[in-house]
């Protein structure tokens, strides 16, 4: 077992500052360890129209030698978290979708490549080509990967990426 690196209380306090009052520490993945949600500025860029309801979050386990536990997107309206591949951290921007009304797109910062589209749809909506993440606020939360996305993380599953935080 590798011992965890000590973190000062001031650094821990600064790292865990967040502007979403309902976002609290919790055992996100059920492993018995409480993870601390952080909102680092370098995690990704937000489009102004979406910045009031969505944010990039990194869940930290400061008892581990590798404290970054999970990276993803928090939807403040529905109080849910969508885990994203760690390899995307720091190279994403969140924008409104031009193709789908009310949907958001995650694009790479460097080449503006579409990596993921997320939408809330009626439960009766056509879901062909979409992965159903779950039901949130009586609607389906659906997502689909961009056409040219290749993941290096072979363990990542979009269908298992949704966490309800209520």
PLM region spans:
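Beta-propeller blade signature
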Residues: 1-2, 51-64
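Beta-propeller fold detector
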Residues: 3-12, 68-73
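Repeat-based blade/solenoid architectures
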Residues: 11-24
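Acidic/hydrophobic-patterned starts of short beta strands in beta-sheet-rich repeat architectures
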Residues: 28-40
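Short glycine/acidic-enriched loop and turn motifs that connect beta-strands
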Residues: 41-47
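N-terminal "mature-domain start" segment
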Residues: 70-92
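Secretory pathway targeting signatures of secreted, lumenal, and periplasmic proteins
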Residues: 85-130
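Surface-exposed amphipathic alpha-helical segments
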Residues: 143-166
């Amino acid at each position: 077992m590798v011992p965890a690196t000590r973190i000062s209380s001031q650094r821990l306090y600064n790292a865990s500052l967040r502007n979403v009052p309902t976002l609290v520490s919790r055992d996100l993945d059920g492993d018995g360890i409480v993870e601390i949600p952080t909102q680092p500025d370098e995690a990704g860029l937000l489009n102004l129209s979406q910045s009031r309801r969505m944010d990039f979050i990194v869940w930290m386990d400061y008892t581990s030698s590798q404290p970054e536990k999970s990276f993803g997107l928090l939807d403040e309206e529905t109080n849910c978290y969508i885990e994203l591949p760690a390899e995307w951290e720091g190279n994403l921007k969140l924008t409104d979708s031009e193709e789908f009304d009310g949907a958001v797109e995650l694009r790479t910062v460097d080449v503006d490549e579409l990596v993921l589209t997320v939408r809330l749809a009626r439960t009766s909506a056509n879901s062909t080509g979409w992965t159903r993440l779950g039901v949130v606020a009586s609607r389906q939360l659906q997502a689909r990967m961009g056409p040219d996305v290749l993941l290096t993380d072979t363990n990542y599953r979009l269908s298992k990426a949704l966490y309800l935080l209520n």
